[in-house]
Each structure stands twice: as C-alpha cells, then as structure tokens.
Amino acid sequence: MKAYAKANIFLKLTGFDSRKYHLLESRFILLKDVFDELELVDKESDSKKEFEIISNFKCENNIIQKAYLLLSRRYNNELKELFSKKSLKLTKNIPVCAGLGGGSSDCASFLLLMNETLNLKLNLQELINLSIQLGSDIAFFLSGFNSANVSGCGEIIEEFEDDIPTLKWTFPQISCQTKAVYDEFDREIFDFQKNNNQAQIYKKLSTKELLQNFKNKELNDLFTPCATLYPKMKSYLQEDFFLSGSGSSVFKVDR
C-alpha cells in the first residue's frame, strides 16, 4: 500500500483550542509521486516481537506503533493473530522532518491496511475519530482527497476542486523539528483574526491562483520562524520558494 506525501499550499495559524493546540487553516494537496510503501510480510521464525516493523529507518516510538496500541484496545485478538504470522514492512522514501506528512501518511495507510485486512468495517468517520487521537494530519490522508481545505487541528477536511500546476521540489538536507518551529512562531505577536480573514480568501482560490498572486511569507506563517531557527533556510525564503508545513521541503511552480 502506498502512503503518499502532502504539500501545504497555504498554512495560516488562527488561534488555539482548549488544549492550547494551534488552530489552522490550510490547503493540502496529495503528492502522488512521493510515497512510502507498507506491506505485510511473513514473520521470521526467530522474531519474538508481538508487533514488528521492518524498515529502512529507525522505528522506535513510531506513530504506527501508537496506532497499533490504539487499535488493540478494541481488536486485540485479531491483531495478535495477524502479527503472530506477519510483520509490517515499511519502505521509507518520503524525507523525514521535511513538512511532507510522511509519518501521518504512514499511520493513515496502516489504519486502512488493518481495516481492509482484518475486515474491521470501520467507516471513514470512525477512522478519522481514531486518527484524532494520534496526530493532526492523518485525517487528510484517510480521506483520499487530492486537494482539500483543512481546518481545526487538522481533523476538519473539505474536498476542494482544484487547479494544481506542476511543482518543482527541493529537499534541503535540513531536519526541521515541527514543535521547535511552532514554538518560534509563538514568540511573535500575531493578529489571529487577520490571519483567519486571509485564510477565508485563500480557501476560495485554486492552488494555481494562490501561487501566482501571493508571496511565500504571506501563504505560510511558519516560513519566517523556520528560517530564523534554521539559517540555511533563509536563502529559500529570499529566492521566493514556497515552504510545505514547518519545513524543510520547498517548491516553486515549474514554468
């Protein structure tokens, strides 16, 4: 099963919820040429792990393991039986700490794979309700939409009929820590009402129109704090690249 990456075309922060989590308004688009892969493979006879992930990257505290534990509260017997014979193979291609939602996409694909393999018969809303307990971007990947306006803490998804130009990507070898970038954003005083008003305009425009008519700093509130924390990102800010998420992946329209 393929776990596709995503890009944020705009990302506006509009306040906090009761848990002090950031509220956002964003346009997510699915990147179908950048993906991880998940599959079930036969378990090696000497493996003693109840749930084993075989991967080309370090898997400790992986969000998939958290999803397994969450599912096991309701489907413990089914999961134990499956993973007594199978391991999960995860081939990681999406850059890590790059603003492309790789971990969230992997988690969504794992939930979908378990729903299908174990015939759990969970509908989309039930899967989204589970995902809210795990992470903010997962709901978009569960939806299967190619483009959507995303709000709340990432759990409110509205499909958008979009016009998406070809994007040219650059993946800097810079590991941007999401929490650190958000913390840096919080050091500044922002007019959240103004941000929300801008977001309501952006939500009505196609991706093509957004990238043609607005500057990178206008579209993504996290670009300036990202460049402050990671000085090597400043050149991309100055050269009119657009930032996905909290970085470090950047892109331009391929002319």
Swiss-Prot record:
For this UniProt entry, the molecular function terms from Gene Ontology, in alphabetical order, are: 4-(cytidine 5'-diphospho)-2-C-methyl-D-erythritol kinase activity; ATP binding
Q: Which UniProt keywords apply?
A: ATP-binding, Isoprene biosynthesis, Kinase, Nucleotide-binding, Transferase
Biological process annotations from GO: isopentenyl diphosphate biosynthetic process, methylerythritol 4-phosphate pathway; terpenoid biosynthetic process
Task: Quote the record's binding site residues for ATP.
Answer: 95-105
Q: What Enzyme Commission number(s) does the record list for this chain?
A: 2.7.1.148
Instruction: Describe its function.
Output: Catalyzes the phosphorylation of the position 2 hydroxy group of 4-diphosphocytidyl-2C-methyl-D-erythritol.
Q: What is this protein called?
A: 4-diphosphocytidyl-2-C-methyl-D-erythritol kinase
